[in-house]
């Protein structure tokens, strides 16, 4: 099993806009679990907001194999979400992929 973790830094500075983006990102990303083959799970969680410098959102997903992760990364539905996020929603991201077990 492969774990794919992405932390997101959002572009908006307005707290209300940021919150709307967090909700929409969570909805769009978690919906991919039902349409992309090889996905075991996709979870998206907002930061607790205790420390201001923390990034506000993290994606934790699991895949059957590295091949399944590779297919996810190029899947048209995933690319559509990425394109939407890259259009002024996300300022930066950090990704870690690793084998579980």
Which residues does each predicted region cover?
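Short S/T/G/P-rich N-terminal loop/turn motif that feeds into the first structured element of a domain
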Residues: 1-55, 64-71, 97-101
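C-terminal structural segments of small proteins and small subunits
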Residues: 66-96
